[in-house]
């Protein structure tokens, strides 16, 4: 059957049988009746068409009449007439005598001379009246063509301008020259010309008042143009006789007005559609039959109850393009749709109907706006109809079935009888509407991003359901809210946080689909789906809270999983039935409605708990006892560890015990060295010798001891050292981006957040007991834990500290991000990876390639082994927030976004119209932490000269290695990476001026840099310091501020602040600037000496080339 025959048959099927009129059949045949605008016939094209197009005139197409024979167009007749006239004139010329030719030629020359001086002014006058008439006609014309009957008074306007002048010249004594052709208008006395011009303006004004009153601005425009055209005729038509000048001017002016009025009467002038002609648009519509528009997902009106057991078999829409792994997982889901925990899923209960109706009312209000174009109105009507159909299929209903036992986040404990009367959470009003795209959540307020189900959820009420006992009652695996996608409003970033996604996790998905493979752990076997119950699929909670769960385990050796988890639930009812977390007792009563140990404010999942299990949970009193019991329970039930893993774990314990002793012995000496901004890290590496590979883990352990983070979050030393030992082993042995650089950045963020800051106001002076935040992102002071450094305290009340304004969880995330931020760095820039199509660049779409790779690789390492889980005592909300902060801090180190962060920070902290940093706002605190790690990442120029040159040597060597590889690959060598042509001093000075300097100045202007007060003498005229060194530092600081971007002035004070960081930055910048000036002087003198011949040592010539050059 051909395609046209199939289409015709389908279109015929749209007509219902006589007397039947079956609407369901007409709805499911794939076609729908509609109306469209017909195609408009193009007007005839030619010279006249282009003239009208230039004059903004739209030609109406001739009516289509196929029955009438084609006639000759008016343009054809005009061309024939002109041709006949030209032939007649040519015949007369050929028939005349030669003498008459000479007389005619002389007369023709005279005529051409007169016309050459007169045609241009006359044409200008005609055009002026033409465009004036078009303008006034457009402003006074009603809708539609041919409505400008009140504009014919404009024909009298040229007469008022010139005929009155003509009568004055004839009857009164004002001379207008001597009357012959050679007389020129300038011979007229000025007072006579001014009087005639005044008379012309009076006539025009009288015409405007009597004939057709206009607006004031239009009247002024007409008077100005009348005076202009009269002056043109008065000064430019001197070659014509005096009597012909006003007559011809009035005649051509009237012709221009007449032409404009004719065009407006017979044609339509285009103008902006201020009010769409809805009625005419509706009349031009023609009925058509078109294919029904379908989306790539199941229709919202096609509920699961009508999929089976009904005579309606809905048409299956086309599937999107998916990968092979996704297709396998989706196919498995389709086979499991009849499971009890799938019942009532996708019913739309998570949609707030009040919000949906509110949106529909807003669309209806938009439809009443007459200024909308027809296509927008049509789209809004379609949206309104879709929302109407969706609201009819999203009525909330109570699920009478017992939920299937799951392994997923706990929900609040509630009475099933109260479900029907309970209102939806206000936080879900605008964020719970389904959408085909995954949204991201920062996890800042406990909301969990729910994984969108990729299957078609169906519900067949005919299938018998399995009965479950009380002990198997747990959380919904895919409850009625599984289609909700929750978002956090007003978030600065869109990083995906690690969370318990509601939906089944398949075996091996975490490892086999992981984009980054760490070099420190082997591949994880994917296993098989055979003989696995849905509750066996691993979730993130397994790796975080059950150290015995290992992905490398064999499925054949696994115990009876349902029985095992049944034993767990029966033995300790205070454990979460889904993830094994404990229901912590410090959660307040106000939070019990919307938060829990795993999901926090994760929405209104209608989970049913029995009264017996609820009573058992209330009997637990001590949190420590519960955690010990849960760990013992997991250890007793764990039979998946192999002998090799057990022996390796024992070896790690012995190594860490000995390492702990070493760290305890060296803690005092190490923390003393770290208390200095110029941390002698290279001396420490040389002193450690063979143990220098442990510098990152030792410094990390020392900092956590100093700040008390180990005690606050109950971090186990064994897992802590296991992970950071593995993390530092993942850093490559390259000149700059190695474990020493990570340690230096870690020290810098610790120093910036724990050292005293002059003039900083502290908002907290004690420690809380919890780590929750309010729904609007503001902290609750009675529940937030803060840290303080044991090695340093504020000298007096005039000093403050960042650690007293930033919660402990956020500072711990900042420290961990500093240790992770260059993990597995290849020693190449982002630009190089993109240019060579490296796998990382392809994976991350050429955007922040290295930063995404560092974060993903470090977290992949953390999740690879249970003995790396040093955060096991964080609850789910805290871990989610922690992971989000770490990722955001690592991504902030991409210098391609440097100026975006700098502008945002200046607008928040240093703008005169800003309220400054609000420490109770989590977004402001996140911005401060991001700028802090950015400053720590490029702190080399702010160190003492020796350390600065050491770091410079490392980055230059690494960049030269990249330049060598680019040369070997035949690629153009990146700027400043060619060993043969170094431009070190110039680039270093530019890097400090444009990158490091503005960032440090902004951070200092915000009052966040550590320092100390310098007392100054009080004097009425001047302020001079007691110390000459302080004066010298002030002078250098002022010079630095002149060279770099000036920082906004803060409050005036008689005391000055000495900042060691800014002092070193000023010194280094001054030295590099002197080297640049010396080089320029040498070039001016023709000397080709290089920087190596200068008075500075060889190391002084090495330049810091930071990652800012990666994008050049």
Curated annotation (Swiss-Prot):
It catalyses: a nucleoside 3',5'-cyclic phosphate + H2O = a nucleoside 5'-phosphate + H(+); 3',5'-cyclic AMP + H2O = AMP + H(+); 3',5'-cyclic GMP + H2O = GMP + H(+). The modification Phosphoserine is found at residues 13, 295-296, 442. It is found in: Membrane. Its main location: membrane. Residues 1-26, 418-471, 1017-1051, 1092-1112 are annotated as: Disordered. Signal peptide: none annotated. Phosphorylation at Ser-295 mediates insulin-induced activation of PDE3B. GO terms for cellular component: cytosol; endoplasmic reticulum; Golgi apparatus; guanyl-nucleotide exchange factor complex; membrane. Its cofactor is Mg(2+); Mn(2+). It is a multi-pass membrane protein. One of its GO terms (molecular function) is protein kinase B binding. Abundant in adipose tissues. Mg(2+) 1 binds at residues 741, 821-822, 937. Residues 436-460 are annotated as: Interaction with PIK3R6. Inhibited by cGMP. Mg(2+) 2 binds at residue 822. Residues 428-445 have a biased composition (Polar residues). SMART domains: HDc (SM00471). Changing residue 449 to A: Loss of interaction with PIK3R6. Its EC number is 3.1.4.17. It comes from the Eukaryota. InterPro entries: HD/PDEase_dom, PDEase_catalytic_dom, PDEase_catalytic_dom_sf, PDEase_CS. Cyclic nucleotide phosphodiesterase with a dual-specificity for the second messengers cAMP and cGMP, which are key regulators of many important physiological process. Regulates angiogenesis by inhibiting the cAMP-dependent guanine nucleotide exchange factor RAPGEF3 and downstream phosphatidylinositol 3-kinase gamma-mediated signaling. Controls cardiac contractility by reducing cAMP concentration in cardiocytes. Belongs to the cyclic nucleotide phosphodiesterase family. PDE3 subfamily. Homodimer. Interacts with PIK3CG; regulates PDE3B activity and thereby cAMP levels in cells. Interacts with RAPGEF3 and PIK3R6; form a signaling complex that regulates phosphatidylinositol 3-kinase gamma in angiogenesis. Interacts with ABHD15; this interaction regulates PDE3B's stability and expression and, thereby, impacts the antilipolytic action of insulin. This is cGMP-inhibited 3',5'-cyclic phosphodiesterase 3B. It comes from Homo sapiens. The gene is PDE3B.
